[in-house]
Amino acid sequence: MSGKTSYKDLLLAPIAKNNPIALQILGICSALAVTTKLETAFVMAIAVTLVTGLSNLFVSLIRNYIPNSIRIIVQLAIIASLVIVVDQILKAYAYGLSKQLSVFVGLIITNCIVMGRAEAFAMKSPPVESFVDGIGNGLGYGSMLIIVAFFRELIGSGKLFGMTIFETIQNGGWYQANGLFLLAPSAFFIIGFVIWGLRTWKPEQQEK
């Protein structure tokens, strides 16, 4: 293992210490698009985690054989192949979720987090470290998606995973659903509050 970085650090640091969305401000588009429901956010989190981990692994395995002039093309080809596999599995076994996620599974190919880890880490590190780093960054991305989706679905519709938590007034209950949280701008507010919370907890993340 290079330097003093442990597998534990590679796996856990992206969740709070160096979160791809909260600190690096990457992957924001999908964080807005797929977080209206916890179910879609959870599936997207798993998909990105698998693609990031496996793409890092494969890029690292062949890194010494990739000509520098075409390294980005090779990385994209590996990532695209993995995304196609994930997309086909979703269509085969979870067609409803695949329809809800729509084009956003395919857009994992252009996700800055996936490309960034392949270029910045996997091209310079051994396979096992690269795989763990990819899984860690996928978990960091996924954890933010799940946090955002939790609040958006709960406040926006009174549900979690499609199950009623707060009975809405329309259905004879007491809760007035806030439709604003089902719109994309609400995700910005939630992400902002999470960033504020993280930087209050970890002052070293605050920009000078």
UniProtKB/Swiss-Prot annotation:
The entry's keywords: Cell inner membrane, Cell membrane, Ion transport, Membrane, NAD, Sodium, Sodium transport, Translocase, Transmembrane, Transmembrane helix, Transport, Ubiquinone
Membrane-spanning parts: 42-62, 72-92, 103-123, 131-151, 178-198
Localization per Swiss-Prot or TrEMBL: Cell inner membrane
Alphabetical GO biological process terms: sodium ion transport
GO molecular function list: oxidoreductase activity, acting on NAD(P)H, quinone or similar compound as acceptor
Top class in the EC scheme: translocase
NCBIfam families, per database record: nqrD, PRK09292.1, PRK12405.1
Subunit-structure text: Composed of six subunits; NqrA, NqrB, NqrC, NqrD, NqrE and NqrF.
Name assigned to this protein: Na(+)-translocating NADH-quinone reductase subunit D
